[in-house]
Structures are given as structure tokens and as C-alpha cells.
UniProtKB/Swiss-Prot annotation:
Belongs to the amino acid-polyamine-organocation (APC) superfamily. Amino acid transporter (AAT) (TC 2.A.3.1) family. It comes from Salmonella typhimurium (strain LT2 / SGSC1412 / ATCC 700720). One of its GO terms (biological process) is amino acid transport. The gene is aroP. It is found in: Cell inner membrane. It holds the Pfam family AA_permease. This is Aromatic amino acid transport protein AroP. It is a multi-pass membrane protein. Residues 1-20, 64-86, 139-155, 223-240, 293-333, 380-400, 447-457 are cytoplasmic.
């Protein structure tokens, strides 16, 4: 116990640059691309490629804004620290708790996807059973130490990256060697009703779901406190990841939508697996299902890491119970991991009660929390930059197009909320935002009242 207390509030720096780049890459190549893209293809057709380019640009601006702050002050808790320091107490409290809830929801969505992927082979296994099994395994691994997490995520991401590159190359070979038959042609990108078969409306209405795919890039900021050399590794990871994401997303979708008309894609199956299955290549379809399963587990693994570090950061700020500062001899925030796990376990119950609608509901809730998250990063960055300018400090990794880039990001967030209000099944998650902010407000007032009472005594 003495030893545990001695290490009680210290996370260990054990993540190398390769870990940080692959953690961010792994956080973004997941269910959004492999499963969420199916419903976007049905609505936007090949225009999904343009949608991912637009959302990717906004995500890059947000990453650069967070990156500028993190390089100057690499701390646990990432941007909630900046919201707290440069914006105010409630902003720090709200952004930290919102980010934690965001990744709990993402974790739930990924576990739900795991259940769907397992059903590709074993349709009789309910999604809740698969979710429960992998929930236990991944949390157990995260209770070891940060290096084990870093190595595991590194190899998870390597599998995904190699698989997507191999799929692009194999798909391109099928396309240009005529092996896949006359139905496989680049003309599928514009001949099946046009590049935007349902017009701009079809694409615009899908931007919220596309945005779901890019949630996870901010993990670069969360890793800062455990990075060996954040001044070099964070800028490198930030700049390189976005190019790779766009190549993987745009490249893979362009090849897939050339191999088979977009009209053949169904909402409940990964389009990656479906297209090769439709082409009669069951070996590749099975291999890709292993990859998409690995992808979901990889993102869930990142979520477990992220949630525990965010709770740890909130406790350091006094915005969460001090018991969450408990760190064992290996530098693992055990209490934070266990609390996050207990809440995430609700996913198993949701999949038991509503297996058909669980993924769609969780995806909508994730996007609402992500909108709050990205908007707060952008606003906190504006205040951070203003403070640094007043101090005469020149930052080492400045964000792009400040302050116009920030304004563009905020307008994009507002547009996404309007789109969600007009989308059946998503509107409820937008109406829950003011309720959620009210709960955060009450929580903050209670925390402040408790702090004053303690001071008085």
C-alpha cells in the first residue's frame, strides 16, 4: 500500500513516437469506416469520397489546434486542462466529463460492432455475448501497464493498416486485370445514377455519420502525458496521421465502389466484407472480417486507455473524486479504468435489450458528444492563443489559419447539429445536448459548493 501511495498520482511515460502515431491512426480507422460507411454509401453513393475529404480537412484543423496546445503544455487530461486554464472552471469541468462520456459511448459502439462482426461467422451468437467476452479481455489487458497497451495498440493498428493497403492493392488489381468481371469498373463511380445520385442533399445529410468516422484523432492529445518526447512526437503524429487517414479512407472507398455498384451495399454488413463476398471471394471476405473485428477491438482498446486517462486528469483538477488518482506500482490508473469499465458495461445490457437499434442509437449519441468536444477544443484554442499573444509567447507548433480555421470548424459543428435535427433517429441525440449540459452545470455547482464547505472547515 505504501508503495502504491507513493506512486499514487504519477503516470509513467512509456509511449514512443511509433506508439503515438499508431494510437491516433488506430483510433480513427475503425467502425466508422468499416461499418458506418455502409449507410453513408446508401445515401450519398460515390459522393461519400468527397464527404470524407471535407470531414478529414475539418478534423485536421481540430488536430492542429489541439496539437499546438499540447506541445506547449503536455499534461494528463489533454484539452480539459486547457479549457480549465484558459476559459474557466465550468468549461474545464464540462469538456473533461463530456470527453469521458464520448469515449464511453464510442467504446459501447465498438463493442456492439464486435457482436455484428462475430455474427458474420456465427449468426446464432447474440451481440451482447460477444460484447461481454471482449469487454472482459480488453479491460484485463489495460490493467497491466502503459507499455503493454502501447505495444498491443501498435500491432492492432499495424494489422489494420497493412490490411487496408493490401485491400486497396488487391482491389485495384481485380479492377484493372478484369478478374472481377465486367461489373467491376471505375465507371461505377459516376454511371450508377451519377457521382452524387441523390444530389448534394444526400451527401450533406450524411455528414454527421461521416464525422463519426473521424472521432478518435484527438487521442494524440491524450497520449501527451505519457509520451517520452511530446515536443517532437506530437507534431509528427498530428501531421502524418491525417494524410494516411485520407489515403486509407478515400483510397479504399474509391476502389471498393469501383469493384461493385454502390446500389448493392446493405446497411447491416461491412461494405468491405460484402463487396468481396458478392464477388465470390469468400477467403478475402473472411480475412477482411477478421480485420474489421480487429479494428473494432483496437478502437475499443484505445477507448479504455483514453477514458481512464481523462478521469485521472479530471481528478487531478479536482473535478472528479480523489480516489480516481490511485495509481499502482506500474503507473496504471486502476481506479479510473475500473470506473470507466463499469459504465461501459451498460453496452452489454443495451445489446441484450435492443440488439437491432443499439448501434444506430450509440452512433448518434457519439456524434452529439463529438460536436461538443470539437467545438470546445476550437474555442479553448482561441482563448489559449489570445493568452499566449498577450504574454508575448510564440508557440512552437501553431495551428493552421488561426482564427479563421477555428471559425470554420465552429460553423461546421453548427451545420452538423442542424443536419442531425433533420435526420430521423438522430434528432433525439441533439435534443439531449441541453439536458446533458444542464446535468454538467448542476454537477459543477455541487462540486464548487463542496469545495467551499471543505475550505470553510
Amino acid at each position: 500500500m505504501m508503495d502504491s501511495q507513493q506512486h499514487g498520482e504519477q503516470l509513467k511515460r512509456g509511449l514512443k513516437n511509433r506508439h503515438i502515431q499508431l494510437i491516433a491512426l488506430g483510433g480513427a480507422i475503425g467502425t466508422g469506416l468499416f461499418l458506418g460507411s455502409a449507410s453513408v454509401i446508401q445515401s450519398a453513393g460515390p459522393g461519400i469520397i468527397l464527404g470524407y475529404a471535407i470531414a478529414g480537412f475539418i478534423a485536421f484543423l481540430i488536430m492542429r489546434q489541439l496539437g499546438e496546445m499540447v506541445v506547449e503544455e503536455p499534461v494528463a487530461g489533454s484539452f480539459s486542462h486547457f479549457a480549465y486554464k484558459y476559459w474557466g472552471g465550468f468549461a474545464g469541468f464540462a469538456s473533461g466529463w463530456n470527453y469521458w462520456v464520448l469515449y464511453v459511448l464510442v467504446a459501447m459502439a465498438e463493442l456492439t460492432a464486435v457482436g455484428k462482426y462475430i455474427q458474420f461467422w456465427y449468426p446464432e451468437i447474440p451481440t451482447w455475448a460477444s460484447a461481454a467476452a471482449f469487454f472482459v479481455i480488453i479491460n484485463a489487458i489495460n490493467l497491466t501497464n502503459v507499455k503493454v497497451f502501447g505495444e498491443m495498440e501498435f500491432w492492432f493498428a499495424i494489422i489494420k493498416v497493412i490490411a487496408v493497403i493490401a485491400m486497396i492493392l488487391f482491389g485495384a488489381w481485380l479492377l484493372f486485370s478484369d478478374t472481377a468481371g465486367p461489373q467491376a469498373t471505375v465507371r461505377n463511380l459516376w454511371e450508377q445514377g451519377g457521382f452524387l445520385p441523390h444530389g448534394w442533399t444526400g451527401l450533406v445529410m450524411m455528414m454527421a455519420i461521416i464525422m463519426f468516422s473521424f472521432g478518435g484523432l484527438e487521442l494524440v492529445g491524450i497520449t501527451a502525458a505519457e509520451a517520452d518526447n511530446p515536443e517532437q512526437s506530437i507534431p509528427k503524429a498530428t501531421n502524418q496521421v491525417i494524410y494516411r487517414i485520407l489515403i486509407f479512407y478515400i483510397g479504399s472507398l474509391a476502389v471498393l465502389l469501383s469493384l461493385l455498384p454502390w446500389t448493392r451495399v446493405t446497411a447491416d454488413t461491412s461494405p468491405f466484407v460484402l463487396i468481396f463476398h458478392e464477388l465470390g471471394d469468400t477467403f478475402v471476405a473472411n480475412a477482411l472480417n477478421i480485420v474489421v473485428l480487429t479494428a473494432a477491438l483496437s478502437v475499443y482498446n484505445s477507448c479504455v486507455y483514453c477514458n481512464s486517462r481523462m478521469l485521472f486528469g479530471l481528478a487531478q483538477q479536482g473535478n472528479a473524486p480523489k480516489a480516481l488518482l490511485n495509481v499502482d506500482k506500474r503507473g496504471v490508473p486502476v481506479s479510473s479504468i475500473l470506473v470507466s469499465a463499469v459504465v461501459t458495461a451498460l453496452c452489454v445490457l443495451l445489446n441484450y435489450l435492443a440488439p437491432e437499434s443499439a448501434f444506430g442509437l450509440l452512433m448518434a449519441l457519439v456524434v452529439s458528444a463529438l460536436v461538443i468536444n470539437w467545438a470546445m477544443i476550437s474555442l479553448a484554442h482561441m482563448m489559449f492563443r489570445r493568452a499566449k499573444q498577450q504574454q508575448g509567447v510564440k508557440t512552437r507548433f501553431p495551428a493552421l489559419f488561426y482564427p479563421f480555421g477555428n471559425v470554420l470548424c465552429l460553423l461546421f459543428m453548427a451545420a452538423v447539429l442542424i443536419i442531425m435535427l433533420m435526420t430521423p433517429g438522430m434528432a433525439i441525440s441533439v435534443w439531449l445536448i441541453p439536458v446533458w449540459l444542464l446535468i454538467l452545470g448542476v454537477g459543477y455547482l455541487c462540486k464548487e459548493k463542496t469545495a467551499k464547505t471543505v475550505k470553510a472547515h
